[in-house]
Amino acid sequence: MGFSGKTYHQFDRKFSETTEGKKCVITGISLHSTVKPISLSSSAVSNTEDEDLCPTTPTADSVRIPTVIPCPPAPKKRKLTLKVSYGPREFFSPPDLETVFIYRTT
């Protein structure tokens, strides 16, 4: 949904006749409304002015922002281990292969 090019929306109103006269029914919502000024007594204004004269910043150690600790460096890649072949492999070759195995009688 996009916004319309208007800067404000107006009310859509319907009027209906009653025995008391005309009645206005609001069917839309306005995005802009006027704000009425607030009137305060002079004693209430003077009490709030005394409190607002010198605002202070809390200086206790518990409310201070902690110092930034630098992040550790990124982990490094491990080096690949190279498999070195030192020539052809030699296997055990007995003169008589049957002597290597043990025969069991069951």
Curated annotation (Swiss-Prot):
UniProt GO molecular function: protein kinase inhibitor activity
GO BP: any one term: regulation of DNA endoreduplication
InterPro entries: SMR
Keywords in alphabetical order: Cell cycle, Protein kinase inhibitor
UniProt KW Nucleotide-binding keyword: no
Function: Probable cyclin-dependent protein kinase (CDK) inhibitor that functions as a repressor of mitosis in the endoreduplication cell cycle.
PANTHER family on file: CYCLIN-DEPENDENT PROTEIN KINASE INHIBITOR SMR13, CYCLIN-DEPENDENT PROTEIN KINASE INHIBITOR SMR15
Protein name: Cyclin-dependent protein kinase inhibitor SMR15
Origin species: Arabidopsis thaliana
